[in-house]
Amino acid sequence: YAIVYPEIPYLQLFQTPKEGAVLREGLTNPGPFEGLRTVETTGRMTEDFIEIVVPVKPNGTTAWVLTRDVSLSESDVLIVIDLSDRKAILYEGENILREAPVAIGDKETPTPVVDAIVDALWVRSESDIYLAPLYGNRLFGLSQHSEALEHFGGRRPALAIHGTDEVEYIGTEISNGCIRMTPADIDFFAQYVTLGTRVSILP
């Protein structure tokens, strides 16, 4: 993944790895909440450009950014969401640190099968951004989106892993696509999850 340098307030995107191929839309920094903009990379790069996955619909949209605008990093922490078993598995390298039951999207707004990174971290006690109690006290925003919704609450329909104040629904299909965890489980995951943590949602 790549983290935008703090002195770059707006990350310019390019359609191809050429200076003249500027796209109209870029990405603000910080974003999407607090914290430096963090984007998923594809592994493709040139001397001056790096290809990224842009956090827009449709999922998998790519663009190029200038190498000088970002720093590359990697994480050995991985969250696997198993939709069939409705559980989240936290890995550090090859070691399983915790397995946790989760609630997932309902039949109308299913949780999509995608790979993503954590591109936003939100903690109720530390943030000026208000989210309803339904989100619990902690949220890991993801770089991919619901494939059933065009927007959600006036924003892009980004997926997230978050806590909940309705733990009785853990293990069910009830959400708009997000993954819900018990407060205890998401607090444990938060000890290891950082911006750039990989998330793999499996069928």
Segments predicted by a language model, with ranges:
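Extracytoplasmic
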Residues: 7-10, 45-49, 60, 74-76, ...
